[in-house]
Amino acid sequence: RNPQITATLIGQALREAAPAQGEENFPLIVISHGYPGNRYLLSPLGENLASKGYVVVSIDHKDSTYEDQQHIKSTFYNRPLDQRFIIDSMGELNSTGGFLSGMIDMDNTGVVGYSMGGFGLVNNLGGGFNEAVVNSFGAPPQGLLAQHVSTDSRYRGGLDGRIKAGFAIVSFSQTFRNL
């Protein structure tokens, strides 16, 4: 996790490789890193899942990578939203004329979250924030976290039914109510 140390990852993925063609659509896996982190941190897992027939996408979360790390407050608010944005974006690529047109089974999406990525995942699976955290010292201003609280109607109405599975790795979860 030291951004000053260079690492070389040797894997099986190929840049600009054509997607595999199959008779059925492939499930989607979204990989969400910790705070700070980057899209490469779980690349061996992503490659392994892709080799087993999953469409895998890994996120660089804005304001939360080694290169652009900001205060963690923005991460609390944005992490669950980032994950849903990526799922929506993959749906667009899956639509007619998109790069992955008709290849993704969008109704069978899984999210792998490491640390703060697990935090977003748990929130997206129904683990709403505790009301006490909305106005706590570490929360973003203007009560932005209120829309992630389990008792908020926006939160309950916004849960994404496409997410059928989750794998939270050492999830940051002190702020959840429904665990």
Where are these regions (language model features)?
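Domain-level recognition of soluble alpha/beta enzyme cores
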Residues: 1-29
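The feature captures the conserved acid-bearing segment of alpha/beta-hydrolase catalytic domains
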Residues: 20-23, 145-179
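Active-site glycine-rich loops that stabilize anionic/oxyanionic intermediates
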Residues: 26, 33-37
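Structural cue for short, hydrophobic secondary-structure segments
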Residues: 31-34, 58
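Conserved alpha/beta-hydrolase "nucleophile elbow" surrounding the catalytic nucleophile
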Residues: 33, 113-115
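Serine-hydrolase catalytic-loop signature spanning alpha/beta hydrolases and amidase-signature enzymes
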Residues: 36-41, 56
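Alpha/beta-hydrolase active-site loop
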Residues: 41, 48, 71-107, 111, ...
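Conserved alpha/beta-hydrolase
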Residues: 48-66
